[in-house]
């Protein structure tokens, strides 16, 4: 049996960062989803309702790669009350030739955080206006910070508005984001205030009730919705999704049962026969992305095993 490589979060942080290379790798993974025979089973989820927790298992095999990943990703959303992070996890890296375990990545959720933020940047690169300079962050956790970091690698962001349910946490995030003086950062008292006159909105919360409503949809707006990765989560009102000029999924087979599209279909706001695009199809040139500056677009990101393997 070959030796198994064991890497800690510190090891991984020293060699993998949220940069343009990471964004390009995730972009390639999306393109492969649209053009190659990717093997990606549905997400396995275990709910632990008495502790406000869930565990997701994701995997995918991308043709041509020597290895594939299986990720175990717990999310226990009462953990901050205990002084613990909401998210953690690990990945197993297996040989695509033999199936033997090559490496165990004890990333504590770091790799998931990086690839999730990188996916948001890919969505913005293909669907937001190139001259987008302002963003609303709906959510004030670590993923909101990383989403902004990734977004700034693909768009010339100057103004940031932040809304979160925890006002103290939101204020602390805003202080941190504005510390170097490169950004104009404002903590907002409401989603309405945060959504006023912005080019991009990023929702990254575990909300079970819609936060984005039809009156928030301004011409030219792009929304990246990150939070609805389970049936009970919902950040975008079905009536708002129905008013979009362009809805894009990371994987339609997932967003029809887990994402924002799931809620719109269930509410009857969107037809079951409506034709939608996947992000990989746009990257591969199979479907159009943003066509006109005034379009309102949304990318529904539920997270894919292809991103983890990439």
Residue ranges and their predicted role:
Residues 144-145:
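N-terminal Rossmann-fold NAD(P) dinucleotide-binding loop
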Residues 11-13, 232-310:
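Adenosine-phosphate binding glycine-rich loop
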Residues 1-113, 119-121, 128-131, 277:
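N-terminal ligand-binding/catalytic initiation module
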Residues 135-136, 297:
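Conserved beta-strand elements of the Class I
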Residues 153-180:
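NAD(P)-binding Rossmann-fold cofactor-contacting core
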